[in-house]
A protein has these predicted regions:
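Left-handed beta-helix
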Residues: 1-147
C-alpha cells in the first residue's frame, strides 16, 4: 500500500522507533505532486529558479512567456532570450547573442554574437557572428559556415 509521510511517522512511533523533525529552508522544499496541477506548480517553481539564476548572471529576458531553460544549459553574458525560446540538454550560448522568438535548441552550441529567430536545432553548431534566418531547421552534425 501507499503511505503518506504523516502515516509513516505514526507507524514508526507505534513500533518504538524514534522520530524527529527538521526545518525546511522554504515551504517549496516540502511540496509534493499528487496530481497534474501540483506537478505543474513544481515545474513552474523549478523553471523560475533556473531563470532567476540566468537573469542574475546577465541574461536579458524581456518577456518570460514560454521561455524555458533546462538545468544543464549554459548562457554567456549579454544574451537576450525572446518569448517562446526553449533551451534544452547541454546547449551552450555564447555572449552577446539574441535568440527568439520561437527558437528551440537541444544540445547545440551557439557562438558569440549570433542571432537566431524562429530556429529549430538539435545537436548542431552555430559559428560566432551568424544570423540564422527564420524557419531554419538544423539537426545532427549541422554547422553554419564561418563566413
Amino acid at each position: 500500500g501507499e503511505y503518506y509521510l504523516t502515516d509513516a511517522v505514526r507507524l514508526l512511533i507505534e513500533r518504538g522507533e524514534k522520530a524527529g523533525a527538521c526545518r525546511a529552508d522554504s515551504a517549496e522544499a516540502v511540496l509534493g505532486a499528487n496530481d497534474c496541477l501540483q506537478l505543474a506548480e513544481l515545474n513552474r517553481i523549478a523553471r523560475g529558479k533556473i531563470m532567476a539564476a540566468h537573469l542574475l548572471e546577465g541574461t536579458e529576458i524581456p518577456c518570460g512567456d514560454g521561455v524555458i531553460i533546462g538545468p544543464d544549459v549554459s548562457i554567456g553574458r549579454n544574451v537576450t532570450l525572446l518569448p517562446g525560446t526553449i533551451l534544452r540538454g547541454k546547449t551552450s550560448i555564447g555572449p552577446n547573442c539574441v535568440l527568439g522568438p520561437n527558437t528551440v535548441l537541444t544540445d547545440c552550441a551557439v557562438g558569440r554574437g549570433s542571432v537566431l529567430n524562429s530556429v529549430q536545432g538539435n545537436g548542431c553548431t552555430i559559428e560566432p557572428g551568424q544570423a540564422v534566418v527564420p524557419y531554419t531547421v538544423m539537426t545532427g552534425k549541422a554547422k553554419t559556415d564561418k563566413k
